[in-house]
């Protein structure tokens, strides 16, 4: 059996998903493809890495196989018996660009196992299994947005997701006359995972200091009670949630000018308040600001490198791509990579 699961890009709502906040992602037309078949032992093969790993029983290797192994462990924890299988994986999702290739791999694995063994679990349960794999087995304290989007994606729609209640709404993504591109900075600073976890701790500290159970109970008034650093972190989360709500409204009204402005202000907040951007992504966003036909841009993903999402009028980005590429190369001696992004449906059999 063969399945595919898409990556995702988040239009807006960055670092809100683990704070019970709102997000506005959509599934993208880049996928992890996965084949599953019965086997005498567990065999995991990656076409992209040209590598095969065999194991008698599931174990943690601190490698790409952990995403698959973690999913199998999560099924077993729920009492499902997963006998040995051969899983072959290939992908046209760029790694590290902020399109969430890991969640796509987890989602493809969860869906394939559920169907192959006849468990036929509902999608939401598979989302929870996939996230558990990343949090408990791989050890990255992610929110639920990435796995949710890979499962529930719908072509020509974004998903307005409340990560606290998991209530969601499909918002039409009518891009006629507009386009979304991803610029990959091709840098990943060492800080990324340690600082990501540190931001999570800081947000937990905000709640502890304020005596609140959830960020949804935090108000602007509460910010005054916080020490400086925590105040900045909390202010970002509160204002980013407001930006998501405004962005949903803008999308519904087809108001891409407003959406673009919200992207720029999201980036400023990630740079100045949450402090997770870096010189390279700041350079890209600053370069794009004020250019003809460019409506908005911001860093996407955990930060400290990765990608920048760009919203523009159709054809406008194409005109300045080379200039951006050259300016970036002159400054950082690094080549940029560009991806035009289109929406896609969620995980499915092929």
Curated annotation (Swiss-Prot):
One of its GO terms (molecular function) is ATP binding. ATP binds at residues 46, 96-102. GO terms for cellular component: cytosol. Gene3D superfamilies: 3.30.230.10, GHMP kinase, C-terminal domain. Substrate binds at residues 14-17, 196. SUPFAM superfamilies: GHMP Kinase, C-terminal domain, Ribosomal protein S5 domain 2-like. This is Galactokinase. The record marks 8 as: Transition state stabilizer. It catalyses: alpha-D-galactose + ATP = alpha-D-galactose 1-phosphate + ADP + H(+). Keywords: ATP-binding, Carbohydrate metabolism, Cytoplasm, Galactose metabolism, Kinase, Magnesium, Metal-binding, Nucleotide-binding, Transferase. The active site is at 146 (proton acceptor). Mg(2+) binds at residues 102, 134. InterPro entries: Galactokinase, Galactokinase_bac, Galactokinase_CS, GalKase_N, GHMP_kinase_C_dom, GHMP_kinase_C_sf, GHMP_kinase_N_dom, GHMP_knse_ATP-bd_CS. Its main location: cytoplasm. Transmembrane segments: none annotated. Pfam families: GalKase_gal_bdg, GHMP_kinases_C, GHMP_kinases_N. Pathway: Carbohydrate metabolism; galactose metabolism. It is found in: Cytoplasm. Belongs to the GHMP kinase family. GalK subfamily. Catalyzes the transfer of the gamma-phosphate of ATP to D-galactose to form alpha-D-galactose-1-phosphate (Gal-1-P). Its EC number is 2.7.1.6. It comes from Thermotoga neapolitana (strain ATCC 49049 / DSM 4359 / NBRC 107923 / NS-E). GO terms for biological process: galactose metabolic process. HAMAP family: Galactokinase.
């Amino acid at each position: 059996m063969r399945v595919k699961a898409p990556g995702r890009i988040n239009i807006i709502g960055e670092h809100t998903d683990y704070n019970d906040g709102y997000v506005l992602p959509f599934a993208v037309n880049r996928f992890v493809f996965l084949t599953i078949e019965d086997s005498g032992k567990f065999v995991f093969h990656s076409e992209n890495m040209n590598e095969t790993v065999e194991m008698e029983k599931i174990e943690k290797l601190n490698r790409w196989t952990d995403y698959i192994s973690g999913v199998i462990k999560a099924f077993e924890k729920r009492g499902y018996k997963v006998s040995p299988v051969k899983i072959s994986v290939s992908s046209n999702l760029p790694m590290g660009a902020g399109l969430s290739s890991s969640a796509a791999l987890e989602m493809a694995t969860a869906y394939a196992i559920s169907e192959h063994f006849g468990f036929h679990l509902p999608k939401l349960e598979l989302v929870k299994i996939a996230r558990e794999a990343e949090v408990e087995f791989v050890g990255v304290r992610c929110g639920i947005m990435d796995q949710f989007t890979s499962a529930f994606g719908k072509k020509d729609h974004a998903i307005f997701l409340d990560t606290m209640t998991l209530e969601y709404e499909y918002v039409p993504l009518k891009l006629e006359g507009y386009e979304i591109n991803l610029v990959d900075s091709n840098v990943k600073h060492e800080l990324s995972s340690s600082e990501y976890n540190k931001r999570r701790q800081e947000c937990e500290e905000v709640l502890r200091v304020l005596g609140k159970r959830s960020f949804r109970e935090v108000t602007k008034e509460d910010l005054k009670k916080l020490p400086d650093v925590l105040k900045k972190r909390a202010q970002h989360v509160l204002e980013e949630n407001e930006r998501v709500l405004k962005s949903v409204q803008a999308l519904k009204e087809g108001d891409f000018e407003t959406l673009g402005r919200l992207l720029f202000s999201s980036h400023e907040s990630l740079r100045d308040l949450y402090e997770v951007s870096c010189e390279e992504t700041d350079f890209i966003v600053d370069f794009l600001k004020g250019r003809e036909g460019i409506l908005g841009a911001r860093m996407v993903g955990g930060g400290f490198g990765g990608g920048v999402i760009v919203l523009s009028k159709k054809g406008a980005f194409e005109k300045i791509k080379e200039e951006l590429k050259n300016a970036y190369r002159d400054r950082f001696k690094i080549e940029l990579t560009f991806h035009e992004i289109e929406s896609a449906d969620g995980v499915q059999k092929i």
